[in-house]
């Protein structure tokens, strides 16, 4: 009987214990990935600042990042068996029709090339800002991304926000203004470059949602496509700006530093590539709000590590402005999350009559093209749990929902 009792107790507690153990392992995995993400992000930014302080060629750093992305992603895509992008349909009927959906003929010039140009311009602007101003201040200015997204969504998508969302932007504005006024190493070109990079990231995030939703391309596959196309914008700029400046200056002091500089450029490119992959991995393990909190924490870590390692002079008021802006980003994400949860409750039908009513009042249907759905009249639809990040729009695949739902800026 005692043995039976023990056996029964083991049977009752076994699944719960296994579930608890699995949850602990999952939590440990997320924590380890977050710590690695923070270390790579902070280390990469410090390395970028060290490079640009001694080797003032920001386009070269951006080119190394793009090349690292193009070199590192294809093996990863093959290892993870990420499906290839759908083929582009021709102007007429294909003699060998594809078994899957096709992309429209103007997909690449209309969507991919503008996004690739945005990736190129945002990367160059971001490195110019790190070159001109401290890393801590550049990342504080990046905290203005929610402001840009709200403004651009209002202008482009005619999307209105709730009063709470607008109020949540006040700490971000106040923090950035306070950090700007008290920044001891302020540079106007650095501020303009950081704002331009943030604006470009915001536009990229908005329109990459449409591409991901309409094309059904995997986000890492799209990231690889954008990186390969961005090289064509980057190389001419590198030749005209960095290479020509180096050849004209004929400064041979760089020659003996080349091995060290090349090593730092390789480390910087690897850190940037690894950040993208780890950010994707974390996003697929946690909720959108948890990801936004992790990303805001990452920004705090980058600012803190850069202040400790680079020892740029700051005041207590300056630090207060930085932290206020970062906490404002978290408040914005929390407000958006609450608003989205409330909106989702209203979207769920309670009765059959509610369901029929929703069907009657549905917005214009998406227009099919070669098996894909492309929205009419700008009524864009996107997948759930879209997350705005510093470098690329990652999307957790799920059921379609409206554009205004589940968007978080970090």
UniProtKB/Swiss-Prot annotation:
Topology in membrane: Multi-pass membrane protein
A Gene Ontology molecular function term of the record: antiporter activity
GO cellular component entries: Golgi apparatus; membrane
Keywords: Membrane, Phosphoprotein, Transmembrane, Transmembrane helix, Transport
Location(s) in or outside the cell: Membrane
Major localisation: membrane
Parts of the chain that traverse the membrane: 50-70, 111-131, 133-153, 165-184, 188-207, 222-242, 252-274, 282-303, 312-332
Lineage top rank: taxon: Eukaryota
Pfam families the UniProt entry points to: TPT (PF03151)
Post-translational modification Phosphoserine, affected residues: 363
Alphabetical GO biological process terms: transmembrane transport
SUPFAM superfamilies according to UniProt: Multidrug resistance efflux transporter EmrE
Stated role: Putative transporter.
Family: Belongs to the TPT transporter family. SLC35E subfamily.
Name under which the protein is recorded: Solute carrier family 35 member E1
């Amino acid at each position: 009987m005692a043995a039976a009792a023990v056996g029964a107790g083991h049977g009752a507690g076994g699944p719960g214990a296994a579930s608890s153990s699995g949850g602990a392992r999952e939590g440990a995995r997320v924590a380890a990935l977050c710590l690695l993400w923070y270390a790579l992000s902070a280390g990469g930014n410090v390395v970028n600042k060290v490079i640009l302080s001694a080797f003032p060629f920001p386009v070269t750093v951006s080119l190394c990042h793009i090349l690292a992305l193009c070199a590192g992603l294809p093996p990863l895509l093959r290892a993870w068996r990420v499906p290839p992008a759908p083929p582009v349909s021709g102007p007429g009927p294909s003699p060998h029709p594809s078994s899957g959906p096709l992309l429209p003929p103007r997909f690449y010039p209309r969507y991919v090339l503008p996004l690739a140009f945005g990736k190129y311009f945002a990367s160059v602007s971001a490195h110019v800002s790190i070159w001109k101003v401290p890393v801590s201040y550049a990342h504080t200015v990046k905290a203005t991304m929610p402001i840009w997204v709200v403004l651009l969504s209002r202008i482009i998508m005619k999307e209105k926000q709730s009063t709470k969302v607008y109020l949540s932007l006040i700490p971000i504005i106040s923090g950035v203004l306070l950090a700007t006024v008290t920044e001891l190493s302020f540079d106007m070109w650095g501020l303009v470059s950081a704002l331009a990079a943030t604006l470009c990231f915001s536009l990229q995030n908005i329109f990459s949602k449409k591409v991901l939703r309409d094309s059904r391309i995997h986000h890492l596959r799209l990231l690889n496509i954008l990186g390969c196309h961005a090289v064509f914008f980057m190389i001419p700029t590198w030749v005209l700006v960095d290479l020509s400046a180096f050849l004209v200056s004929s400064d041979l002091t760089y020659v003996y530093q080349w091995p060290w500089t090349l090593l730092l450029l390789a480390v910087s490119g690897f850190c940037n590539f690894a950040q993208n992959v780890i950010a994707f991995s974390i996003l697929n393990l946690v909720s959108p709000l948890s990801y936004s909190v992790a990303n805001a924490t990452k920004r705090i870590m980058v600012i803190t590590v850069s202040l400790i390692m680079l020892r740029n002079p700051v005041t207590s008021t300056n630090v207060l402005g930085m932290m206020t802006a970062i906490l404002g980003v978290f408040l914005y994400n929390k407000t958006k999350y609450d608003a989205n949860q409330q909106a989702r409750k209203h979207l769920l039908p309670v009765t059959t009559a509610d369901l029929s009513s929703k069907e009657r009042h549905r917005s214009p249907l998406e227009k099919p093209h070669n098996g894909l759905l492309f929205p009419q009249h700008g009524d864009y639809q996107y997948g759930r749990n879209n997350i705005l990040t510093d470098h690329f729009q990652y999307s957790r695949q799920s059921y379609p929902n409206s554009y205004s739902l589940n968007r978080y800026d970090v």
